[in-house]
């Protein structure tokens, strides 16, 4: 059920050689390999840091950072509950976590995208803008999510919430791209979505023979944590960045001394995301059984120890949403979430039910996905809310509301299902069906293991890599409140190619997407002179 980190765009692996070498400016990544430098080397440590920060040339900045809303437009109080349309708790739990992501919500409420969008139909950003605006501006009510949000994904059965979450994030990311123009990989990583959720890994390999160093950079949108041997999120992060020795059969082929030699490899976060999505790998690759252990996670998380540069002071993130799975395997269960409203109060969002909660209850859950935001970002948004005009606060009757699906007032305008353009659903389904999307993840997956032995590229330039589905198993209906499916939008007849893809998918899903000890494939080198 759990999937590994997403990588949108290519990776960059920078190679520094003492002699001039030809380069490919359109490479999906670049590699830096350098020998140990003398004390007065013209390429100082500071120079190398600046070089790494640039990573790769950007042909077009799709979403300049100044375009992000600087002030909060979110209501301070909690918004609406979401109606379960039949096995859609995974959709509702994911949508609530995105709705209460401050930078994303503020951008949606600014309506900036819809004013300039040229797609009009089939745009996930426009669809999410309508949903987030409606959810936040209708506190005390229950609304029905638009079918277009799950078009091409929902098939009438329980699906993986994290998988749907990243499916939605990817669709929003695609909506940021100009559909009529070719965009290079580096520019794709400048979109609004990548600015909010994205950062870069750095994998550094040091040859123990000549002391040459190779740095590889790879974009991420979420971070998957192995919790089998970890009792806390901090321990899982420590294991992730723990140095690894490469020797024997796994010895490193050094590009500096041109021989196989023992080496050390370290994976760290080179740049930090505004919003951090941590996925706890709770489900077995083979059986799908759940690792139902308690893994501690803090309200405030310092990510500085896991960064490439650890001497720049604390990098504190605060928890604002938790996605929870209740059940014993990926075959069954129920999803719900906890979110922190702008006012600072925590709420449990369980489909139509919205109830006040406490931080003690939030931190005691067997979390599946954790959402953190940089403390400075949260404080900036909170301060702007306190200075601005706030909507009415929820009364006690609203806070304690437990609206059941069978008790919905169908005549309330907020509860009416929006008019759904059939062409919108049809187009969204055609553009990205679940099976086709999963197949692309398997065929074009990238890993943070960085196989430095290969530098040739194999990914087509028009393929967008995000993440794979590990499990074929769908979650059966075990939630008593779930109705029969109303969102089965995948009944369209697949093409011959899609049928072939679906058949191939079964043999691919069981493979782990990331394994720290394995090597990375499909690289193209951008060689830079010292």
From Swiss-Prot:
SUPFAM superfamilies linked to this entry: Cysteine proteinases
UniProt-listed CDD domains: Peptidase_C19E
Record GO biological process: protein deubiquitination; proteolysis; regulation of apoptotic process; regulation of protein stability
Gene Ontology cellular component annotations, sorted alphabetically: cytosol; endoplasmic reticulum; nucleus
Taxonomic superkingdom: Eukaryota
E.C. number: 3.4.19.12
Region annotation (Disordered) ranges: 382-414, 509-530
Keyword Cell membrane: no
Bias type Basic and acidic residues, positions: 382-392, 398-413
Annotated catalysed reactions: Thiol-dependent hydrolysis of ester, thioester, amide, peptide and isopeptide bonds formed by the C-terminal Gly of ubiquitin (a 76-residue protein attached to proteins as an intracellular targeting signal)
USP domain residues: 80-375
A GO MF label: cysteine-type deubiquitinase activity
UniProt xrefs under Gene3D superfamilies: Cysteine proteinases (3.90.70.10)
Record family assignment: Belongs to the peptidase C19 family. USP17 subfamily.
Record protein name field: Ubiquitin carboxyl-terminal hydrolase 17-like protein 18
């Amino acid at each position: 059920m759990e999937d590994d980190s997403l990588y949108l765009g290519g990776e960059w692996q920078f190679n520094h050689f003492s002699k001039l070498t030809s380069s490919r400016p359109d490479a999906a990544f670049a590699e830096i390999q350098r020998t140990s430098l003398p004390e007065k080397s013209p390429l100082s440590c500071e120079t190398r840091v600046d070089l790494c920060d640039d990573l790769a040339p950007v042909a077009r900045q799709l979403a300049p950072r100044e375009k992000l809303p600087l002030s909060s437009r979110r209501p301070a109080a909690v918004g609406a509950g979401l109606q379960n349309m039949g096995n859609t708790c995974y959709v509702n739990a994911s949508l609530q976590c995105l709705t209460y992501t401050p930078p994303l919500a503020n951008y949606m409420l600014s309506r900036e995208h819809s004013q300039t969008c040229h797609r009009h139909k089939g745009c996930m950003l426009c669809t999410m803008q309508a949903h987030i605006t409606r959810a936040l501006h209708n506190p005390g009510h229950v609304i029905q999510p638009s079918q277009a949000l799950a078009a091409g994904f929902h098939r009438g059965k329980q699906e993986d919430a994290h998988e749907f979450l990243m499916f939605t994030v990817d669709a929003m990311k695609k909506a940021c791209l100009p559909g009529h123009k070719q965009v290079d990989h580096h520019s794709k990583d400048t979109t609004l979505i990548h600015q909010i959720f994205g950062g870069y890994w750095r994998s550094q390999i040091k040859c123990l023979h000549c002391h040459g160093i190779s740095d590889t950079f790879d974009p991420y949108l979420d971070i998957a944590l192995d919790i089998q041997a970890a009792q806390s999120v901090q321990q899982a992060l420590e294991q992730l960045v723990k140095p690894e020795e490469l020797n024997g059969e796994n010895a490193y082929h050094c590009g500096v001394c041109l021989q196989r030699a023992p080496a050390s490899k370290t994976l760290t976060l080179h740049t930090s995301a505004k919003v951090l999505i941590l996925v706890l790998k709770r489900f077995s690759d083979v059986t799908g059984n759940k690792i139902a252990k308690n893994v501690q996670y803090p309200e405030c998380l310092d990510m500085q120890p896991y960064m490439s540069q650890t001497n720049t002071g604390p990098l504190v993130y605060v928890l604002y949403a938790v996605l929870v799975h209740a059940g014993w395997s990926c075959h069954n269960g129920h999803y719900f979430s906890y979110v922190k409203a702008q006012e600072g109060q925590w709420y449990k969002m369980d489909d139509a039910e919205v109830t006040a909660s406490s931080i003690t209850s939030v931190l005691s859950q067997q979390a599946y996905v954790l959402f953190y935001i940089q403390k400075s970002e949260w404080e900036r948004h909170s301060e702007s809310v306190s200075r601005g005009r706030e909507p009415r606060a929820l009364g006690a009757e609203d806070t304690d509301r437990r609206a059941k699906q069978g008790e919905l007032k169908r005549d309330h305008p907020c509860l009416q299902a929006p008019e759904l353009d059939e062409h919108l659903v049809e187009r969204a389904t055609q553009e990205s069906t679940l099976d086709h999307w999963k197949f692309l993840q398997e065929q074009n997956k990238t890993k943070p293991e960085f196989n430095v032995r290969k530098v040739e590229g194999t990914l087509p330039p028009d393929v967008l890599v995000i993440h794979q589905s590990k499990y074929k198993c769908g979650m059966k209906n075990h939630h008593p409140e779930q109705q029969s499916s109303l969102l089965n939008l995948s009944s369209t007849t697949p093409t011959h190619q899609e049928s072939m893809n679906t058949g191939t998918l079964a043999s691919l899903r069981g493979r782990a997407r990331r394994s720290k000890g394995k090597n990375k494939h499909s690289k193209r080198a951008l060689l830079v002179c010292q």
